[in-house]
Amino acid sequence: MKLKKRTIFLAFLDLCAISLILVVYVVPNFKNWWITTSVSTGKHKWFANIFYSDEDIKEVLTNNQVIEIDEEVNLDDITFENEKKDSYDSVYDEQILDREDGALYKLINIKEKDYSGYLVAIYDPSRIQLATSDYYGQSLKMIAEKEKAVVAINASGFNIAQGYANGMVIKNSKLISNYGYNRHGGGLVGFTNKNVLMLTTGNSTEAISKGMRDAVEFGPFLIINGKPATIMGNGGMGTANRTVIAQRKDGIVLFLVIDGRGANGSKGIDMNGLIKILTRYKAYNAANLDGGGSSTLVINNELINNPRGYYGDNWERPLPNAWIVK
């Protein structure tokens, strides 16, 4: 009897090993998904090397990347003409423009087969500003509460161990920090004194001279002057929770937050999926922000999405800064 149980157990292990080999080396797209998702995380890049060599990883990343539009944002293209209409170009345009009189924002549910999340339309971009944490350990809800923010999303990437924001941070037209590095392409993402979303690869001095008021450094840039970036494969950042900031030509700002890692049944989204959503809602300029467990949306001091990080559901990471609406 003991021998039979042992035989069954060994057979089970063999079956598991064979199944793993088939998944890792035979199932289409598993390699791309595993490598790109692993290397885009803050702490688990080494996962990619569990199954694949450095040569495999390099090849996959070469074939999965974002080719950004090589243009400066045309700041004068933003018109700030976004009155309600009697007819709309699409159901998505209607979702944005059909709102209550005097509304500051509108929350729109995003639901597709493999992912879900939220889009917030901000009708007065002059109410958007960058808020910073007072100390390492403050969550988005804590930042929003101290700032009396109506809407808030996460912004910069950051050093997980020490909490400082990666890359340049501009607030009130001054460079307030410049630590670490930005490894996701893009550049400075922020608003000018005229409340236009500016995306620029220039340094802080150049950006401020052009009117940059508040900004963080991240990317990639997904849309510039209405032209979407070219996405090779899945874009090189895999499938995960995402946060995006965008602006339509009519001046309306879009905060997009997509859940991932199985939260609420949402697997997450890649760069192709983000551009699909942004194009539907007529984003004219758009940039990816920090994602993964950092992707968080708070409205009126209530956590709206389901951030899933190292400690499970609805666990908010401490953040260095946030985009808020006051």
For the regions a language model picked out, list residue spans one by one.
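Conserved hydrophobic/aromatic beta-strand scaffold that supports enzyme active sites
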Residues: 117-121, 188, 221, 244, ...
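Active-site-adjacent helix-turn-beta-strand microarchitecture at beta-sheet edges
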Residues: 158-235
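Conserved, well-ordered active-site substructure
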Residues: 163-181, 231-284, 289, 294-326
